[in-house]
Amino acid sequence: MSHSKEIISYMNRLGSEAKDASSVLAQASIEQRNASLDFIAEAIELNRDKILSTNQKDLELAKQKSIGSALIDRLELNDNRIDSMISGLKIVSDLPDPVGEITDLDPTPSGIEVKKMRVPLGVVGIIYESRPNVTADAAALCLKSGNSCLLRGGSEAILSNKIIWNCLQKGLNKSGLPKECVQLVETTDREAVKTLLHLDEYLDVVIPRGGKGLVQLISDESRIPVIKHLDGICHVFIDKDADHQKAQDIAFNAKTYRYGICGAMETLLIHSEIANSLLPSLTKRFESEGVELRGCDKTLEISEMIAANEDDWSTEYLAPILSIKI
């Protein structure tokens, strides 16, 4: 059997198993679905040290390949990030059951009532880059909503994804749900992604979570409906009536909390009436943190920094760089 045929056969098996498991999961009670999330959280806590040591191996390999600092940041796991994974699972477990919820009740002139009911989609394919915590986050949301999932993480996080997936399997087994409710593509072969996007017999929707290139590739190649996002060029606007200290704290946190995530601020907009009083102290604060600042002409009149060019207003830096405009 050729390599390509082996990949196709492997991916079809994963898709078929996920589809079969989705029928069981769709009928599972909310108590059982919540129990699976609680047991997964428990398994992650019990395997914390293994997860951290395995993640170190991924980090070492990534550094050997001279992967950029933004990706390294997204790849890294530590105790705080594992705590966030565990708390995220518990938060999802505590959410109301979305399955079977009735919305938009519309009576008709004939007396017939038309309602919308939330039901599971079936099997969700999720393709993501770098961040191993997405393995737990994505699985949690799918399980809560009664959907099986087929996960394909980035090759740089393969070892971390596998150890977290093992925790997912333990939680599913303990809750009595099929372990195939959450499938992980264990090969880093790019052919697997292309094959996944052609599994329209088994998958009902595909969700990409990553950079513009990944989203575009999936949009172009997929035979399956795609739920996608756009560039993460996040802006913060400080209005003239804003509390100065609170505005500074929010802007500083929005940029420096984590540089390498799509939710990080890339452009700061400041109302002209408060720019003179706000900018000097705010720029000093950013500079003390090592953030490179790029400003418009009006900004340069108030604080010394690099002159921004037109591309800066449409760039997702994923780095300690910030554009400021008045």
Segments the model singles out, each with a brief description of its role:
Residues M1-V114:
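N-terminal Rossmann-like NAD(P)+-binding subdomain of aldehyde/semialdehyde dehydrogenases
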Residues S36, T188-E191, S277:
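Short, conserved clusters of charged catalytic residues that mark active-site
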Residues I8, E17, S130-N133, D137-S145, ...:
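ALDH superfamily catalytic-core signature
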Residues S29, R33, G146, V206, ...:
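Residue-level signal for inorganic ion chemistry
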Residues I40, E156, E266-I270:
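Conserved short loop/turn motifs at secondary-structure junctions
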Residues D94, T103-D241, Q245:
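Rossmann-like NAD(P) dinucleotide-binding subdomain of oxidoreductase/dehydrogenase enzymes
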